[in-house]
């Protein structure tokens, strides 16, 4: 295993070469990861919104956005600015505190989840021993915000949408957690860094998707349900509930629900790429690349190049999954609420339990292949 990418050390070393002290250089570094996380997540959402509009247009043989910037790339920015400048209307009979707090509870946990997402061996803000379960626990907060928004709106459609969101989240959170447990069992860790490292050394053949194909499908289906993507968008079904829990919202509060939804979609695709598709792993290890170039692995410019390749690999896998999610929106019809709950409790949960037991048995029988 190579020593990995020490971006922090390279950054501090570069600043020290310009005459700054170690303490000042470290102080400059401290806010950068958090700032980069917020900017990166925001840019990622803008890209996904544009991609969804263009892919949806192609699926329906339309042109899609084309006037706001080249190929319509500024359309998501225009949509955001429009919502920012719209009036924030609060209906008279709502609970104003819960009505305002609901959208915040939807967005904040999703952004916090990016703290444990690695784009490289040391390209992560917080490498926690229970990182992947932190994501699961944070994702379970969002339905509380949706239920709070629906209840406080004093609207029957909004309340039904909030109740559906809570029921849907509870139904699919358990199979998702069981799929993660199978991966943690093979990796002997809940750290996202350790899970990616466990898949390294064998190129594409080392990815967990080959050892956990059923777990991959369970996780991906449950993640789409958590993101409320078609065919699981029951909480905001327009034909049945007007706009669900969003019915009484306007302006930026209305926009926050969509921000949370798209940020969660990108986050879910990132988690899938980390758990099952090798994360940032590049076919050429850092040590071998350094040997070919006849330089030390700790060389700052080599660290930057390797970090960039890791980020590119992670994003390619992530946006490939987002592309699949967008295509599914225009391929599958919406299910009924009873079908949704029956599928989660009567099919997905038993299959997830069997997959976990099978993984445990294979780990004992083939410890080398399954992380014994």
From Swiss-Prot:
GO terms for biological process: aerobic respiration; photosynthesis, light reaction. It catalyses: a plastoquinone + NADH + (n+1) H(+)(in) = a plastoquinol + NAD(+) + n H(+)(out); a plastoquinone + NADPH + (n+1) H(+)(in) = a plastoquinol + NADP(+) + n H(+)(out). Its main location: membrane. It comes from the Bacteria. It is a multi-pass membrane protein. It is found in: Cellular thylakoid membrane. One of its GO terms (molecular function) is oxidoreductase activity, acting on NAD(P)H, quinone or similar compound as acceptor. PROSITE patterns: COMPLEX1_ND1_1, COMPLEX1_ND1_2. The keyword Transmembrane helix applies. Keywords: Membrane, NAD, NADP, Plastoquinone, Quinone, Thylakoid, Translocase, Transmembrane, Transmembrane helix. NDH-1 is composed of at least 11 different subunits. NCBIfam families: PRK06076.1-2 (NF004741), PRK06076.1-5 (NF004744). This is NAD(P)H-quinone oxidoreductase subunit 1. The gene is ndhA.
């Amino acid at each position: 295993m190579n020593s990995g990418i020490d971006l922090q050390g390279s950054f501090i070393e570069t600043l020290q070469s310009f005459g700054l002290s170690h303490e000042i250089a470290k102080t400059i570094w401290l806010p950068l990861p958090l700032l980069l996380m917020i900017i990166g997540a925001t840019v990622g959402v803008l890209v996904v919104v544009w991609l969804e509009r263009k892919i949806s247009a192609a699926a329906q043989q339309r042109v899609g956005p084309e006037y706001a910037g080249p190929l319509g790339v500024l359309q998501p920015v225009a949509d955001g600015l429009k919502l920012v400048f719209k009036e924030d209307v609060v209906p008279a009979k709502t609970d104003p505190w819960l009505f305002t707090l609901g959208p915040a509870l939807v967005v904040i946990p999703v952004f916090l989840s990016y703290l444990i997402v690695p784009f490289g061996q040391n390209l992560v803000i917080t490498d926690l021993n229970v990182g992947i379960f932190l994501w699961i626990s944070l994702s379970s907060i969002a339905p509380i915000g949706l239920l709070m928004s629906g209840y406080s709106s004093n609207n029957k459609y909004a309340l039904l949408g909030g109740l559906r969101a809570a029921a849907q989240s509870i139904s699919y959170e358990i199979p998702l957690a069981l799929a993660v447990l199978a991966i943690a069992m093979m990796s002997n860790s809940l750290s996202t860094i350790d899970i990616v490292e466990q898949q390294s050394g064998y190129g594409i053949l080392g990815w967990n998707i080959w050892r956990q194909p059923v777990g991959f499908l369970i996780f991906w289906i449950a993640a789409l349900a958590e993101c409320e993507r078609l065919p699981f968008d029951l909480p905001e079904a327009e034909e049945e509930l007007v706009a669900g829990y969003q019915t009484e919202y306007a302006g930026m509060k209305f926009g926050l629900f969509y921000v949370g939804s798209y940020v969660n979609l990108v986050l879910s695709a990132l988690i899938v790429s980390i758990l099952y598709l090798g994360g940032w792993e590049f076919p050429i290890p850092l040590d071998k690349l350094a040997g070919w170039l006849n330089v030390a692995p700790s060389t700052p410019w080599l660290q930057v190049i390797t970090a960039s390749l890791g980020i590119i690999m992670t994003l390619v896998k992530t946006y490939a999954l987002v592309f699949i999610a967008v295509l599914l929106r225009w391929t599958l019809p919406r299910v009924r609420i009873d079908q949704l709950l029956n599928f989660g409790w009567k099919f997905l949960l038993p299959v997830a339990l069997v997959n976990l037991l099978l993984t445990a048995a294979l780990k004992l029988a083939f410890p080398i292949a399954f992380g014994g």
